[in-house]
From Swiss-Prot:
Residues 153-223 form the DRBM domain. Coiled coil: none annotated. Keywords: Cytoplasm, Endonuclease, Hydrolase, Magnesium, Metal-binding, mRNA processing, Nuclease, RNA-binding, rRNA processing, rRNA-binding, tRNA processing. Belongs to the ribonuclease III family. It comes from Francisella tularensis subsp. tularensis (strain SCHU S4 / Schu 4). GO terms for cellular component: cytoplasm. Digests double-stranded RNA. Involved in the processing of primary rRNA transcript to yield the immediate precursors to the large and small rRNAs (23S and 16S). Processes some mRNAs, and tRNAs when they are encoded in the rRNA operon. Processes pre-crRNA and tracrRNA of type II CRISPR loci if present in the organism. This is Ribonuclease 3. Its main location: cytoplasm.
Amino acid sequence: MVPEYSRFYNILGYNFKDYTLLIRALTHRSKTKKNYERLEFLGDSVLSFVIAEVLYKQFIDLAEGKLSQLRSKLVKGATLAQLASSLKMDEYIILGASEQGGHKREKILEDVFEAVIGAIYLDSDFATVKKVILKWYQPIISSINLDTIKVKDSKSKLQEILLQNALSLPEYSIETIDGKDHEQQFTVVAVSKDLNLRVKAQGTSRKKAEQKTAEKMIEMLSQQGLHEKK
């Protein structure tokens, strides 16, 4: 065990055999080309499957659509960032000079959380990483209130409105990215060809900007008499 990471291992509930995997998982691209991005990709898939499986087994009467909404809620940025902070990951993130001050940035915390999962998977096996993930998520999963999944995010709600009215889904694209790496502002444009609508909004991440864009389009559809059918 590397001494400076012994406390972190205890917090994670996992001891790395190959600590270089953990270093890679904590390293932002601003520091070096050997960063967490590939591990993040792997961890995202592992996490999504583990959460999907536990929800499938725990909520046996829940329909597929509701399971998808609940999984989305559990693996979205805010939840991952909160878990990363509770596990003190922000204290160990390795950033380059251009990203100093970004330890608390939600997108970075989200990415590192997924990267650490990917690193644990490569360092051990699926059964082990699943056990670790479920330990981290236990307080959240045990307190799930099924009523909360009735609340859809704006993109999902917009999608349902359009599909219910036999309209094609909007196309989202990034128009601009402004600001320094740790305080970027994304401008996203959503286009509905069927309705000849073009809407834009800003957010501190692409996901947030897309949600705000969807909110605006929902408001415009409402003015035209298009609402979600219950």
